[in-house]
Amino acid sequence: MSFDQFAPFMTLGRPDAVCDECSRPVAPNSISDDDAAVNTTETDTQHANIPEEQDVINIKLDSTFNAESSAETIDLKVEGVKLAIVSQQPTYEAITAETTSSVATSEEASSDTATSLTNLTSREPSPSSSSASSVAEECPSEEPASDDTVPAASEKNHPDGTLNPNYHDARADEVHPQHEVVQVQAPHLPPPQGVQPAATENPDHDSLFSVFTQDHNPLLSGTIVGAPADYVASTPGKKIRDKAASALNIWLQVSPDDLNQIRTVIDMLHNASLILDDVEDGSVSRRGRPATHMIFGMPQAINSAGYQINRAMMEVLKLGSQDCLEIFIEELDRLYIGQGYDLFWTFNIKRPSVEKYISMVDYKTGSLFNMLVRFMAAKTGAKGGVETDNNKAPIAPPDLTRLVVLLGRYFQIRDDYMNLTSDEYTLQKGFCDDLDEGKFSLTLVHALENSPEAEKSILRHLLTQRLSSNGQGMSLAQKHLVIDIVKGAGSLEYTVTALRKIGMEIVNELDQIEGVTGIENKELRRLVEVLRV
C-alpha cells in the first residue's frame, strides 16, 4: 500500500535525527549537545529554505490488514500526535488524536498539529475511540544502557540524556474531551493480493458492475449487418427474376400479398448470392460500381450475405406454408452445390464437359428460377387452382418446371457470352472480367475441347499464369490472345447457336402452356425477346 496520497495531510515538518537504539525519529531537544551540533549543520544545509522558527513534527505510518473483516488499520505515529485510521472500504474511520507529553515542540504547536489532522470532518466522540487510539508500537532496545540498567517506562531519558524508547506517558491513555473522532474520506484501496473482499460491498460499487447481470441492455438493430446487402440491392440490375414473376403470375394467379412476399425472398437470396459470388470470384466491380466487399471489407460482406439468407428464410415462414419452407431448403442446397462445382473447376483449372457445365448452370442459376415458380405453384394450390378468362372454374396449375430450367440456362450462357463480347458489359465490369476470374464459360469449355493442341496449351498456360498475377488477373494483351483463340476455334459462334436453340425451346414451351391454360402470355414473350442475342 502506498501512503504517498496522504502526504499533503502529513507533511508537517522535516526530520532532524533518529534514535541510535531503534532508528526512530526523535525530537530536537532529545539529542545530545554534540549530536545536535552535527545534525544542525547537516539539516540546515539540506533545508536552508525552511524558516528556523518552524516547528518540526515527525511522522511514522504502520499498516495492518484484517483478512476476516477486509479492514485495514493505519497507525500514524506522530511525535506529539497519535492518530489511528481504520479502513472499511471505502471510508477510513474511528480516528482519535491524542497529544502526549513527549512532544519536543511547544504546547501550542502540538495543539495546532492535532487540530489540523482532526478537523477534516467533525463527528461526535465515539466510545471506542479510546481503545482504538491507544494502540502504540513498542520499540525494543537492541542493547542495554551503558550502565547495564534498562530505564523504566516512566523515565523519559537514558542516563546519557538520549530519549528512552520504552518511555510511556500515562497521560496518553487518558481521553480528553477536546479530542474528537473524525471521518476521513479516502480513495478506494483494494485488499492485498490473495485476499478476497467481504461479501457485503458498497452499493455504489455494486451498481458499477450491475450492467453484467441486468436483463435489459440495449438491443442491437440489423442496420450495420444489413448495410452491404442494401448497397448491392441499390445497384442497377436487369431484374430478370422480378419480371419473370410478374409474367408467370398471368398463369398462376398468386395473390398480390403472397407474390410480393415471394419476390422479397428471391431478391434477398439473389443479392446475397451476388455478394458471395464477387468475393469468391475475386471481382472488384459489380454493375459498374465497386463490388460490395471492396467497400465494406470482405468479412463484413460475407457476414451480411449470411444474414440475408437467414432473413430470407424468416420471410418464407410468413408465407405460412410448410411446403414453401421445404422448397427453400431444397433449392438453396442446389444453389450451393452448383456454386461449389464452379469454384472447384476454377481453382483447379479443370475443364468440365459441356454436359457437366449445363448441370452446374441448372443448380447454380436455375435454382432461384425454380424456387420462384415452385413457391408460386404452392400458393396457387392453396386456392384450388387457376382460373381462366373464359371459364371461371379452377384448373390445375400448369407445370412450368421445364420452362424455368430453360430460362435459367439461357440467362447464364447469355451472361457469360456478353462478358466476352459486349461493350456494355465492358463499361460495367471491365473488359472480359470473367477471364480475370478464370471462370469456365461455355465458350471457353468449347475452345479447350476444339482448338488445336498448340492453342489448347496456350489457353491452359494463360489460365495458370492468372493465378500467379497477385490477384491482378490477365493483362489486356493476354485477354486479346484468348479472344483470338476462341474465335479461331469457332467457340463464339457455337455459343450463339446454343442460345438460339434454347430460345426456340422456350418459345415452344410458351406455346404449349398457352394452349393448356388458354391464356396468352405476351409479357413473358417480350422478356424472352429482350434477352435474344
From Swiss-Prot:
Catalytic activity reported: isopentenyl diphosphate + dimethylallyl diphosphate = (2E)-geranyl diphosphate + diphosphate; isopentenyl diphosphate + (2E)-geranyl diphosphate = (2E,6E)-farnesyl diphosphate + diphosphate; isopentenyl diphosphate + (2E,6E)-farnesyl diphosphate = (2E,6E,10E)-geranylgeranyl diphosphate + diphosphate
Cofactor binding remark: Binds 3 Mg(2+) ions per subunit.
Binding site for Mg(2+) 3: 415
Pfam families, sorted: polyprenyl_synt
Binding-site list for isopentenyl diphosphate: 238, 241, 270, 287
DNA-binding keyword on record: no
Amino acids binding dimethylallyl diphosphate: 286, 364-365, 412, 419, 429, 439
UniProt region (Disordered), positions on chain: 98-169, 187-206
Residue numbers binding Mg(2+) 2: 277, 281
Biased composition (Low complexity): 98-138
UniProt keyword list: Antibiotic biosynthesis, Isoprene biosynthesis, Magnesium, Metal-binding, Transferase
Binding site residues for Mg(2+) 1: 277, 281
Any single biological process term in GO: antibiotic biosynthetic process
Pathway: Antibiotic biosynthesis
Co-factor(s): Mg(2+)
GO molecular function, one term: geranylgeranyl diphosphate synthase activity
E.C. number: 2.5.1.-, 2.5.1.1, 2.5.1.29, 2.5.1.10
UniProt family annotation: Belongs to the FPP/GGPP synthase family.
Purpose: Geranylgeranyl diphosphate synthase; part of the gene cluster that mediates the biosynthesis of sordarin and hypoxysordarin, glycoside antibiotics with a unique tetracyclic diterpene aglycone structure. First, the geranylgeranyl diphosphate synthase sdnC constructs GGDP from farnesyl diphosphate and isopentenyl diphosphate. The diterpene cyclase sdnA then catalyzes the cyclization of GGDP to afford cycloaraneosene.
Entry protein name: Geranylgeranyl diphosphate synthase sdnC
Protein's organism: Sordaria araneosa (Pleurage araneosa)
Top-level taxonomy: Eukaryota, Fungi, Dikarya, Ascomycota, Pezizomycotina
